[in-house]
Structures are given as C-alpha cells and as structure tokens.
C-alpha cells in the first residue's frame, strides 16, 4: 500500500507542470505560443511582431515518460485451467515496477480473426491470477497481460499459443452389464437386444464390428445415444454368432468392450444306431454322434425302449454321454426296439434314430428241480391270549365284553351266563373276527348281573375264560 500510495501521489504532476507552463507568461518573444490542451488558449490572437520562431520540443509536445517510470512485462504468464466456459491464467510480478509504483494489471484478449485487443476488466486489477468467464464453446483467442503504473502500461506478456474453448474431455468408459460378461446365448428366431451404457465427454462416437468386420445393416441395427449404444437383431440366426466389439471414442481416447453371442438350435438325431448283441435279459447298443449339434455342445443322449406288444416308449437313460450302452432287466419272451435322441441346451432333437432289428429276449431252457419240501403243521388247540375282565355297568347303557383267542383250525365260540348258554337271545349280540371275541349286552338291567363265560372249541381241544358283570342301579334322589 505504501508503494501504491507513493505511485498515486505524483500521478498528476507532469500534467500540472505542463499546464502551468502554458499559462504563465515567459520572457520569450510575444509571437511564441505554447501548444496546450485548451482550445481557448489556441484561439488567442497573435501580436504584430517579427516572424515567429519554430516552437521548441519542450513547449510543442507532451514529454514521453522515461522508461524507468513504466513497469516491465509480467513474468511467467501461465495457463492454469480451461473449461467449457472459462479460462484461468496466472503470472508473476514484473522485475521492474517503475519509479511511480504499480497500479495493477490489465488482462486483454483478442479473438481469432480480429485485430482489436479487448480488456477483460474495466480497470487494472491488483491480482496475479484472473479467470475469464462466460465464454462460448468454440471460442479461440489470444491472451496478454500488462503491468500498469501512473506513467502508463508496460510491455505485455503474451501466451505462445491461442486458447480454444471446448468441452471438458472425459475419457470414455464402457460398463458392460453383468449378464453380458459371459457368452450371451439365444435360440434361433429369438430377438437380440443389447443395451450397453458408456460414459465420456464430449459425446462419444460409438462403432460396432462383428468378427472384425462392419455390421450387416440388412440383419443388424445399431442406435447410439448420449449414454448408451443399442444392438438389435429382430430374428437371430446361427450366422449371427460371433464376437461383437463396441468401440467408444472421444477425440484421441477410446474404450473397447467385447461381447460373445452364440445362437443355437436343437441338434439333429444320431447319425446311425446298431444293435450289437443280445444275451439273457440284456441288449447292447452303439450309435454315432449327430452331424449337426445345433451350434453348441451336446448335453448327452436319451435312450428309450419299446415292447413290440404295447408299442409304448419308456426312457432308459437320460443325458448319457458315451455312444455305447447296455440295457438290462428286459422281460423274457418280449421283443424290443430302441431309439436314441440327441440333447443340447435347446432340448431334445426333433426326431430319434431307431434300431432296425428287434432284440428278442429268449426263454432259457432251464428245468426246475425242486427239492423235497416238508409242510409244517400249524394246527393248534384254542388258547386265550387276552382273558375277560370284570366289568361294572349302569342300567340302560349298552356294555361290551372283550377277549382274544388263538386256534387252528378256527374255533367255535360259545357265550354263557352263569354256566347257561345265551346263544339266540336277542338281548345279546356275539361277534368274532381275527381272533377277537366280543359280547354286546344291550341296555342291561340289574337282572343281567352275573358270571359270563367265553368258550372256544375246535377238533384239538377247548378253552374258556370268564368274568363278573355287575349292573348297579342308580341311587334314588
């Protein structure tokens, strides 16, 4: 501030000196008139006198400021940053500030094709870094900066190359979706619709290739937006399989991504099949792989058999990889046909290869020679495995007596009350099933109390069990 104040102090002294010298009369001849900025003074009439002499340099023109009063050019003018709408430059103070001190710096620009230098600010700025804003994309211009003192502006410092305002460059990046990082499989006739996002500034240019060649526009369409590229195939064919490469470019920068597409269909059937051998209940088969695997690996073969009598096919083996097999557990006396399907990711082949010959499972010439067999006698006299149990009942409510007996042949069951048979009495119902004997007494009364006996009789003997039934009358209220 002291330096600035010092430079501002004498800023007007040269002009004041020149003005005063023009107004104060001098000892020079009256014909000599000093040239000044005042029009009025230029119109003063000339006195009658001898011819005037030529004016001296000190009175005719304003003296140029000495070189030591003007600052030198700023140092190290540097371009710090360029964006899509602004530019920032910085510099170092000049080596020589001048005797009158530094008032600031003037930053100017000159657009390409123009000759006029336009100041960025209306007055000098006491800063060594400045940002020019609100620039338009595509602008191209030169920049210079000058140091200014009271005596005037010093020589400028200028950038060597013009500045070009353009979008910030962001290196392109392709973000391949996770499901496309491995082989993308579609079936013949299905739609292929791939959307690949990317990044980059300014707007990247995207191109596709198929196996290193340009895309066939008759089959494949491509659309590129600001942030993604779409590859579309309406009806995929096996010829569309291959390596698709997406290249995204931003000026000299580029990014690439590779997507493998595999278009598949159902395989053809095995080329041939042969019945190798038949023995016992077994048959051996052999076949050759199909000529067309459907543009992908086989998952295996399905082997089926059919009995000549029924004609129904039954699966014997699934996803079987070898080309030979042995089928066992065939039924003696039947004749069998065999067929084989091929299988891949799309499923089974539409047709199968069938054996021309039948496999006849012959009956073996074996005569059975049974050894002597001793038949076991399972006859058994009756015996009770579960006896009758004493029971107490309430009048008017049916009650049941249970026991179980074992005997062979089946025994005859006789029920008795107080040693008297009760067969045929409608009050009682006797049942016997699987050795369990049941006697139901319908709505008993106290008169039905007594000892009940169950007797089992067959040709080998007899057995009996008994119990006591007590029917108690309800107490009177």
From Swiss-Prot:
Pfam families the UniProt entry points to: fn3, I-set
All copies of domain Fibronectin type-III, residue ranges: 73-168, 269-364
Domain Ig-like C2-type: residue ranges: 172-260, 382-466
Residues annotated with Phosphothreonine modification: 6, 26
Domain of life: Eukaryota
Presence of keyword RNA-binding: no
Tissue: Mainly expressed in the skeletal muscle. Slightly expressed in the left atrium and arteria mammaria interna.
An individual GO BP term: regulation of striated muscle contraction
Cellular compartments per GO CC: M band; myosin filament
Molecular-function annotations in GO: structural constituent of muscle
Chain spans, region Disordered: 1-73
UniProt keywords, alphabetically: Cell adhesion, Immunoglobulin domain, Muscle protein, Phosphoprotein, Repeat, Thick filament
Family: Belongs to the immunoglobulin superfamily. MyBP family.
PANTHER family: STRETCHIN-MLCK, ISOFORM U, TITIN
Function according to Swiss-Prot or TrEMBL: Binds to myosin; probably involved in interaction with thick myofilaments in the A-band.
Protein's UniProt name: Myosin-binding protein H
Species this chain originates from: Homo sapiens (Human)
Gene responsible for this protein: MYBPH
């Amino acid at each position: 501030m002291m330096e600035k104040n010092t430079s501002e102090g004498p800023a007007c002294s040269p002009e004041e000196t020149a003005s005063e010298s023009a107004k104060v009369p001098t000892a020079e001849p009256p014909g000599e008139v000093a040239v000044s900025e005042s029009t009025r003074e230029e119109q003063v009439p000339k006195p009658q006198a001898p011819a005037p002499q030529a004016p001296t340099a000190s009175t005719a023109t304003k003296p140029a400021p000495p070189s030591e009063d003007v600052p030198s050019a700023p140092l190290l003018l540097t371009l710090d940053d360029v964006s899509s709408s602004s530019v920032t430059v910085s510099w170092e103070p000049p080596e020589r500030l001048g005797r009158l001190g530094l008032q600031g710096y003037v930053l100017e620009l000159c657009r390409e094709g123009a000759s006029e230098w336009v100041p960025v600010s209306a007055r000098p700025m006491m800063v060594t870094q400045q940002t020019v804003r609100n620039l338009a994309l595509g602008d191209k211009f030169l920049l210079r900066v000058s140091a200014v003192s009271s005596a005037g502006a010093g020589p400028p410092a200028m950038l060597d190359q013009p500045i070009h305002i353009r979008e910030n460059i962001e290196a392109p990046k392709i973000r391949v979706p996770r499901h496309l990082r491995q082989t993308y499989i579609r079936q013949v006739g299905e739609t292929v619709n791939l959307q690949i996002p990317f990044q980059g500034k300014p707007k990247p240019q995207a191109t596709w290739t198929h196996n290193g060649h340009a895309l066939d526009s008759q089959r494949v369409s491509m659309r590129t937006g600001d942030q993604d590229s779409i590859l579309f195939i309406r009806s995929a064919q096996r010829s569309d399989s291959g390596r698709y490469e997406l290249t995204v470019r931003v000026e000299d920068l580029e990014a690439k991504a590779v997507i493998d597409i595999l278009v598949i269909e159902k395989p053809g059937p095995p080329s041939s099949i042969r019945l190798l051998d038949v023995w016992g209940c077994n048959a051996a088969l052999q076949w050759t792989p199909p000529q067309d695997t459907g543009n992908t690996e086989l998952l295996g073969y399905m082997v089926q058999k059919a009995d000549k009598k029924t004609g129904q096919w039954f699966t014997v083996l699934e996803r079987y990889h070898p080309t030979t097999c042995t089928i066992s557990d065939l039924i003696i006396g039947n004749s069998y046909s065999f067929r084989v399907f091929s299988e891949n990711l799309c499923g089974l082949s539409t047709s199968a290869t069938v054996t021309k010959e039948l496999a006849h499972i012959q009956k073996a010439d074996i005569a059975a020679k049974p050894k002597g067999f001793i038949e076991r006698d399972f006859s058994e006299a009756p015996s009770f495995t579960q006896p009758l149990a004493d029971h107490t009942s309430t009048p008017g409510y049916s009650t049941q007596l249970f026991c179980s007996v074992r005997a062979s042949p089946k025994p005859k069951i006789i029920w008795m009350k107080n040693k008297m048979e009760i067969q045929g009495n409608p009050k009682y119902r006797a049942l016997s099933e699987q050795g369990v004997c049941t006697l139901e007494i319908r709505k008993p009364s106290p008169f039905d109390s007594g000892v009940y006996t169950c007797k089992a009789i067959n040709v080998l003997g007899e057995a009996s069990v008994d119990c006591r039934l007590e029917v108690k009358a309800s107490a009177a209220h």
